């Protein structure tokens, strides 16, 4: 009996010692109680992408192979080309033998055939949903003429984004010596991709079928299961190779708050998805959406001369919401900037914008419009007003 009691006490002491000496990774967030998050993956990062604030990180600058998360840069260059007008979603892409080959041998594939003609939008779906290496190669060749030239464009764009620890060797993420990036750099390119919201239409789709022009329809199933099972998830990209293990750049939005989680080197897809979900849930608990300016609300009364009736109301063209940390005491300020060089202002005409700052950081802006037709006071008008004031004061 005494022996059992000693064993019991010894066991309790071991548990107590283990709990006291365990050192979990902690959240990097100023001005709050630091929570504890356990991450098994080799590297991880949680960001609020609107401000770029890093909420959590673990080995965020460690160079690791990203597998198909590479395709975030491929999609970014494609979306930039679309949004700049360089290409259109309806443009046709002819699939090369090289593109088809990159989708064979057990690699992720959209099942494209040599000579097959697909639109830019269909190829984007193949990259975003099916993670097709053939689709990524077809897009690369269409945009830059060859995959080699496209990879140069990828690395050039990475440098401009400040991705200091990234080197791309291909457009798909296939294993290749020296093809590396970091969780932090992935967050940077993911943050930039989110500036092209059209892409979320593709990355947030779970299943899609492309049948036009084919005997056998192409069935696309998203490798990112979080878009189906995690509330608000609409992207961005998963990745796996035996070298990289399981990776993801995941994003979700709830109640106007968007978060971005990066996981690299998770041992299996269940842990990858669980840890990305845990990070995003933590992010949602730390931030909230605030409506700062309502559409059509008065922002500024703009005087156009010395006469009291020479003014217009600058109103907001649309709502402006911002994301702030819960409990933050940082001052929120509005700075209206109105064009005063015009002689005449038309009702409904855009006359400037209003900037919103949290502390000294610009977090958003909204266009302003005039609420009326009005002519600016001229020199003669102002002189007459001054004479009237002199006369009234004399009387």
Language-model features and meaning:
Residues 163-167, 175-395:
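Domain-terminus/edge residues, biased toward the C-terminal soluble/receptor-binding domains
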Residues 2-28:
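Sec-dependent N-terminal signal peptides of Gram-positive bacterial secreted proteins and lipoproteins
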Residues 2, 30-32, 247:
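A generic local structural motif
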Residues 4-5, 66, 116, 120, ...:
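Structural motif marking the loop-to-transmembrane transition
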Residues 20, 35-37, 252, 344-345:
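Sterically constrained small-residue positions within well-ordered secondary structures
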Residues 24-197:
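Active-site-adjacent loops and short helices of periplasmic peptidoglycan-processing enzymes
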Residues 17-18, 83, 287:
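Hydrophobic alpha-helical membrane context
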């Amino acid at each position: 009996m005494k022996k059992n009691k000693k064993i019991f006490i010894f066991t309790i002491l071991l548990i107590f010692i283990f709990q006291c000496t365990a050192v979990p990774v902690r959240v990097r967030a100023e001005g709050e109680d630091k929570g504890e998050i356990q991450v098994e993956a080799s590297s991880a990062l949680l960001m609020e992408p609107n401000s770029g604030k890093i909420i959590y990180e673990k080995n965020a600058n460690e160079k690791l192979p990203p597998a198909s998360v590479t395709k975030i840069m491929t999609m970014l260059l494609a979306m930039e080309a679309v949004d700049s007008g360089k290409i259109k979603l309806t443009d046709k892409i002819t699939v090369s033998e090289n593109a088809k080959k990159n989708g064979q041998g057990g690699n992720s594939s959209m099942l494209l055939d040599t000579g097959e003609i697909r639109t830019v939008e269909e190829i984007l779906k193949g990259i975003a949903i099916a993670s097709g290496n053939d689709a990524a190669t077809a897009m690369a060749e269409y945009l830059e003429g060859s995959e080699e030239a496209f990879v140069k464009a990828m690395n050039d764009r990475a440098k401009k984004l400040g991705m200091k620890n990234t080197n791309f060797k291909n457009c798909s993420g296939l294993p290749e010596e020296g093809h590396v990036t970091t969780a932090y750099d992935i967050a940077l390119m993911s943050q930039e991709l989110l500036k092209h919201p059209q892409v979320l239409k593709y990355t947030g789709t779970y299943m899609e079928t492309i049948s036009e022009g084919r005997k056998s329809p192409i069935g696309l199933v998203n490798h990112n299961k979080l878009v189906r099972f995690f509330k608000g998830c609409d992207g961005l990209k998963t990745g796996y190779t035996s070298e990289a293990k399981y990776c993801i750049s995941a994003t979700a939005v709830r109640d106007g708050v968007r978060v971005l989680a990066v996981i690299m080197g998770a041992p299996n897809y269940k842990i990858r998805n669980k840890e990305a979900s845990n990070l995003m849930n933590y992010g949602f608990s730390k931030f909230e959406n605030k409506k700062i300016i309502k559409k059509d609300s008065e922002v500024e009364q703009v005087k156009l001369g010395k006469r009291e009736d020479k003014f217009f109301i600058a109103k907001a063209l649309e709502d402006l919401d911002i994301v702030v940390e819960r409990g933050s005491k940082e001052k929120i300020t509005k700075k209206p900037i109105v064009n005063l060089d015009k002689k005449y202002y038309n009702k409904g005409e855009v006359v400037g914008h209003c900037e919103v700052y949290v502390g000294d950081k610009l977090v958003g802006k909204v266009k302003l419009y005039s609420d009326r037709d009005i002519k600016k006071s001229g020199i003669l008008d102002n002189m007459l007003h001054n004479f009237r004031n002199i006369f009234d004061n004399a009387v």
